[in-house]
From Swiss-Prot:
The gene is rsmH. It comes from Cupriavidus metallidurans (strain ATCC 43123 / DSM 2839 / NBRC 102507 / CH34) (Ralstonia metallidurans). SUPFAM superfamilies: Putative methyltransferase TM0872, insert domain (SSF81799), S-adenosyl-L-methionine-dependent methyltransferases (SSF53335). GO terms for molecular function: rRNA (cytosine-N4-)-methyltransferase activity. The lineage of its organism: Bacteria, Pseudomonadati, Pseudomonadota, Betaproteobacteria, Burkholderiales. S-adenosyl-L-methionine binds at G42, G43, H44, D62, F86, D105, Q112. One of its GO terms (biological process) is rRNA base methylation. It comes from the Bacteria. GO terms for cellular component: cytoplasm. It catalyses: cytidine(1402) in 16S rRNA + S-adenosyl-L-methionine = N(4)-methylcytidine(1402) in 16S rRNA + S-adenosyl-L-homocysteine + H(+). Pfam families: Methyltransf_5. This is Ribosomal RNA small subunit methyltransferase H.
């Protein structure tokens, strides 16, 4: 998912990134069962349904109540929606049989950013919420009001790759102490202003709060944990020949996806010390269980029309059968 700015305005509108490429890679059987793990505003789901035959089906997942409401506008018997993280697809789809493909379009969508009340963006004044699912869980403001300095620094460093994480954490705790209440950082503007003061060196073309907001969003929504669980669940659900298509927008996500696919496509004999010393035939070595079908980036035309698509990376893999190696 990627937000984009309309020409001449600061209003964000949603534009599905790598739409045709993702659907082309995903749908290889018009009569197959498919999963869209990140419905968003339905761009991919609608395109998948357009490719499916009468016997094809699509189950979508999303944590965002607004996405669930949008999914309700799709009047198609082949389509259903689950109000849940894609990490739960294994449990939710248990007993339905294998699927022909799973699509994950990671990250945050422009409608989520554009709605100030969600608290995802430092560009809009709003409560510091940041939850994908507003019906459950702790908000970013609530977590910052109770977390200790070490935990705050760790989250900002690990999930935001922010080199000033410790300084920002110290400033947050100091602000909390000075205020005498837990609501010292209640709004997006509160946090953005604090980070701007704590970060002395600015990255060209990037607001100093960018990495901190990303880190908190990822942590509050357990995005990386969900991704790891979701990849495993997707692999288990896929039939032989089934496709796993994942679009990511930052290096933390892409590294997880890359490692997962490569671990299945290129099993290492080095993973077992005993295998390193053993004179083995090729047939005795660990066999690949997925085939890598490529890594794709948006073309120049798409990036020109939607600059924020520049960071998108799509990886595609196919599940192999036991005799495919």
């Amino acid at each position: 998912m990627s937000p984009t700015e309309s020409p001449g305005t600061t209003t964000l509108r949603h534009r599905t990134v790598l739409l045709d490429e993702a659907v082309d890679a995903l749908v290889w059987r018009p009569d197959g069962a498919y999963v869209d793990g990140t419905f968003g505003r339905g761009g991919h789901s609608r395109a998948v349904l357009a490719r499916l035959g009468p016997a094809g089906t699509l189950v979508a997942f999303d944590k965002d109540p607004a996405a669930i409401a949008e999914a309700g506008t799709i009047k198609d018997a082949r389509f259903s929606i689950e109000h849940a993280s894609f990490a739960e697809m294994g449990d939710r789809l248990a007993g339905r049989g294998p699927v022909a493909g799973v699509l994950l379009d990671l990250g945050i969508s422009s409608p989520q950013i554009d709605e100030a009340a969600r608290g995802f963006s430092f560009r809009f004044e709003g409560p510091l919420d940041m939850r994908m699912d507003t019906t459950r869980g702790i908000t970013a403001a609530e977590w910052l009001a109770q977390a200790d300095e070490q935990d705050i620094a760790r989250v900002i460093r690990d999930y935001g790759e922010e080199r000033f994480a410790l300084q920002i954490a110290k400033a947050i705790v100091a602000r909390r102490r000075e205020s005498g209440d837990g609501g010292a950082l209640a709004t997006t503007s509160d946090l953005a202003a604090l980070v701007a003061k704590a970060v002395k060196t600015r990255e060209k073309g990037q607001d100093p709060a960018t990495r901190t907001f990303q880190a908190l969003r990822i942590y509050i929504n357990q995005e990386l944990e969900d991704l790891e669980r979701g990849l495993k669940a997707a692999y288990e659900l896929l039939q032989v020949g089934g496709r796993l298509v994942v679009i990511s927008f930052h290096s933390l996500e892409d590294r997880i996806v890359k490692r997962f696919m490569q671990a299945h496509a290129r099993p290492e004999r080095d993973a077992d010390p005993a295998l390193r010393r053993a004179p083995l035939r090729a047939a005795d070595l660990p066999q690949p269980t997925m085939k890598l079908l490529g890594r794709f980036k948006p073309g120049a035309e798409e990036v020109a029309g939607n600059p924020r698509a520049r960071s998108a990376v799509m990886r595609v893999a196919e599940k192999l059968g036991e005799q495919s190696a």
